[in-house]
Amino acid sequence: MATRRLQTPIGLRFAAPLRRVLNRIEARLDSERERTGLWLPVALGTGIAAWFALPAAAHWIGLLFLLASGGLAGLLIGWSSRIGRMVVAGCGMTAIGVLLIWARATWVGAPVLAQPATTAFSAEVEAVEPLPAKGETRLILRPRGRDDLPPRVRVTLRDQAGSTIVPGERVGLRARLMPPPAASLPGSYDFAQRAWFDRIGAVGTVLGDISRAPDAGQGGQPLRARLSEHIHRQIEGSPGGIAAALVTGDRGAISAEDEEAMRRSGLAHLLSISGLHVTAVIGFAMLFARRLLALSPRLALGGYVLPLAAAAGALAGAGYTWLAGAEVPTLRSLIAALLVLVALLMGREALTLRLVAAGALLVLVWRPESLVGPSFQLSFAAVTAIVVLHESPVMQRFMARRDEGLVRRWGRGIAGLLVTGLVVEVALAPIALFHFHKAGLYGALANVVAIPLTTFVVMPFEALALLFDSAGLGAPFWWIAEQALRLLIALAHHVADAPGAVATLPRFPPWAFALAVAGGLWILVWQRSWRWWGLAPLLAGMAVLAQQPRPDLLVTADGRNIAAAVPGGGYALLRDRAGDFVRDTMNEAGGSDAPLGALAALDHVECNVDFCRWIQGGRIILASRGRDRIEGSVMAPACAAADVVISDRWLPRECVGRWLTIDRDSLAESGGLAIYLGEKPKAVAALTAGDGHPWRNAPQVSGNDEAVPKAALAR
């Protein structure tokens, strides 16, 4: 039998098209060679994010092998090609990100309390955070002589007396302690993760009074605390709380209502010391220093004015950061500001994406865990969006200086500020929706007034008031600052109360958020036409966000709090006496902004002392709410007639729902649940089975050693 010879080998048949594709990509990368380095922090962050997303060490090691294979593939492509170098560098930086966060999580490891415990102990006070708006004081303590307690404990003292406690003081107390709580619902805040990196092994509440040494507190409060107290004496209430927050970072005196209004109006960023505040301080310090130094002909003619003014600005920024407590967001802003000053001194453009990328690299190497927090994501997303917008030819032409009247120039400036605000709000919306399940829609308009008001009125007059207080002449400046702050709060409430001011969404999959972020980065980093390829993943991710259904049932990790979706939007609680924290958590997880009602008050719900029964999504729900013991034989018929059975207690074997049975044992493994009832019902758990992250498998201490007397003080 004759055979026909294969004319073209299969490998060669695909080689030519592949080569053409690679050549086109190579040409595009070469045309954007100045932007390729911007992907280094993205690759580093991808490795860090992958470590958080993957559950166990086997997956992390597998990812490292996969990245090593990718690096080898890049070498095979060729180091001389830009594609090969980018593949090698990208895989290498991603692997470094995995190893960096893995090492950091291991290095900060400390024992965690195994179970709730009530115990007396003595401790050294490490930090004091007054919360006058709540009538509380928060303390970070280092227990002494108690190996059965974690090395750092955070407790809350429910009175104002704790505000006189100073760091370094030794105290004796009795407290109800518990392990740092994990996320109570899918997508909600995971304090256990945050506490692990802060080395906090237990949280709790002080019971009774704190015992202090007779001479305790005579050394005086730290400068930061004294300054906050002085500001609160000059301006009372929430305006004083915001004034203190702008100087020392102390937000404890801001009422919950005003803080929520700031958040809903898109002005919450003004309450945390960040790039805006640090930049304002450095800018005013440089302006003052330049005007003063320019009076010296020798310095002016010698070209020393700008370097000395930059040094003065750097010192002012560093001092401000130290005064504000040197928190991670403030330090991050200081690093970025110092990079801008270095660029100015080198004669380079002040703010570019390269500087933003360098700042991101420094922060991720220093604190890799900050990547998954909203603060890092919001700040770098905002700065990146602003830089990209003002690099665009259209914006540069619009903002270019020209001969025109004062009104037109001011109008153009306001329009530029409004456009910038809109772009920033669009960039921040997916992040806010992912972390907080809500986003203010009118933030751009509110910030047009709020940012200049804060930067050019509140902060300068507050600084002048503090300066003139040394001579007893600060009262007029305090009055002006207070009126501006009251105007700011009124603006926040007006915007927050406007119809449609807040968009809410329920929890959505992390992969959809990652898809939207990847698309946004592709658009922001590149400059050529292929940047718009990023619209595909961006719109796909946003489509998932917009179409995400709200859960029919929400069950917290302890099983005590259950929220059921009600017709027309909103949720109703099984136990309607739940506190504000539980209510806020339920509303956020369900993507609702409506007040929570009482489940027992609904017409379609049948309740007795022990149980409530209702139909949800075509399925029968049975939830326990009593504390009395019920025999399994008595419960069995009711459980068998229900599709879903929920209890915060251990259920007997006889109690089994037709589809899902939830009790204390199952919740210990799954954590809180979001339940979707429909044709294909599903339950999404807050905890991942087999999660190997260190805060899920931490070394534990009992906290049960009562050898220390109740009021003992370590000597």
Residue ranges and their predicted role:
Residues 65, 69-70, 78-91, 204, ...:
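Hydrophobic alpha-helical transmembrane segments in multi-pass membrane proteins
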Residues 32-77, 373-376, 380, 473-524:
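Membrane-embedded alpha-helical segments of integral membrane proteins
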Residues 2-34, 95-269, 641-644, 650-654, ...:
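Membrane-interface helix/helix-cap signal primarily in integral membrane proteins
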Residues 102-162, 172-174, 545-616:
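Membrane-interface segments at or immediately adjacent to transmembrane helices
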Residues 47, 123, 175, 246, ...:
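Divalent metal-coordination and catalytic microenvironments
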Residues 132, 211-218, 260, 264, ...:
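Membrane-interface amphipathic/re-entrant loop segments adjacent to transmembrane helices
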Residues 571-649, 683-715:
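Pre-active-site segment of Zn-dependent metallo-hydrolases
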Residues 2-116, 335, 409:
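Helix-loop-helix transmembrane hairpins and adjacent membrane-interface loops
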